[in-house]
């Protein structure tokens, strides 16, 4: 582990101090905010870049949950329509996607609290032994969104039906799927949204450890 850390420190030389924001302009404010940013940064070969202009979609943060039943070796997936998957002109696949439970982190909220709340709102389940897995950037070339991924122990017998908030026009169907089946669907490309792919890969690598850890709790 010390060797790995040493290697990372040798590779990554730049920090926040090596990029300078020159200006920003709000282009649109709605469900999300769109800004135009101008910046410059240090170059690998030395010196400074020219002025770079980029549009950024400001989304903030989100939490996602690998809702896993260790006794049944099953994972809870939710299905809902996604306009981004419907809008792609070359896609002939259904825009109703199989996903992990997830939701946006509002100002003042903690990611772990959002994970627990969304589990109840989207799937009607209670989560215990919530464990932080990792946090990742979602397409940081043009989007500001940090996704916090958690794993949580659930009783899959609770998970059924259709859920979501009426005031947000949510229509979410709950599915209980064996872990190996969900992983196979991911490998076949049937589950193809980023955070679900990351989450199911993480679960495949760590499910045995979760089973042992939760058994002791």
Curated annotation (Swiss-Prot):
Keywords: Hydrolase, Magnesium, Metal-binding
Keyword tRNA-binding: no
Family membership noted in the UniProt record: Belongs to the Nudix hydrolase family. NudF subfamily.
Binding site for substrate: 31-32, 54-55, 82, 104, 139-141, 145
Keyword Manganese in record: no
Annotated residues for binding of Mg(2+) 3: 118, 122, 170
Residues holding Mg(2+) 2: 118
Organism: Haemophilus influenzae (strain ATCC 51907 / DSM 11121 / KW20 / Rd)
Full protein name: ADP-ribose pyrophosphatase
Residues the record lists as binding Mg(2+) 1: 102, 122
């Amino acid at each position: 582990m010390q060797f790995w850390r040493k290697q990372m420190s040798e590779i990554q030389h730049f920090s926040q101090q090596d990029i300078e924001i020159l200006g920003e302009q709000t282009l649109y404010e709605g469900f999300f905010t769109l800004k135009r940013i101008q910046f410059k940064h240090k170059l690998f070969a030395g010196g400074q870049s020219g002025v770079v202009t980029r549009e950024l979609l400001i989304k903030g943060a989100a939490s996602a949950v690998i809702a896993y039943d260790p006794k049944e070796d099953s994972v809870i997936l939710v299905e809902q329509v996604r306009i981004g998957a419907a809008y792609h002109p070359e896609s002939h696949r259904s825009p109703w996607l199989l996903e992990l439970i997830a939701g946006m982190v509002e100002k003042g909220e903690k990611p772990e609290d959002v994970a627990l709340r969304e589990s109840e709102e989207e799937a009607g389940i209670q989560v215990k032994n919530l464990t932080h897995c990792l946090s990742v950037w979602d397409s940081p070339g043009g989007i500001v969104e940090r996704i916090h991924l958690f794993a949580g122990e659930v009783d899959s017998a609770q998970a059924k039906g259709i859920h979501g908030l009426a005031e947000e026009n949510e229509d979410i169907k709950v599915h209980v799927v064996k872990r190996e089946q969900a992983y196979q669907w991911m490998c076949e490309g049937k589950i193809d949204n980023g955070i679900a792919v990351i989450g199911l890969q993480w679960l495949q690598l760590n499910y045995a450890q979760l089973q042992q850890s939760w058994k002791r709790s």
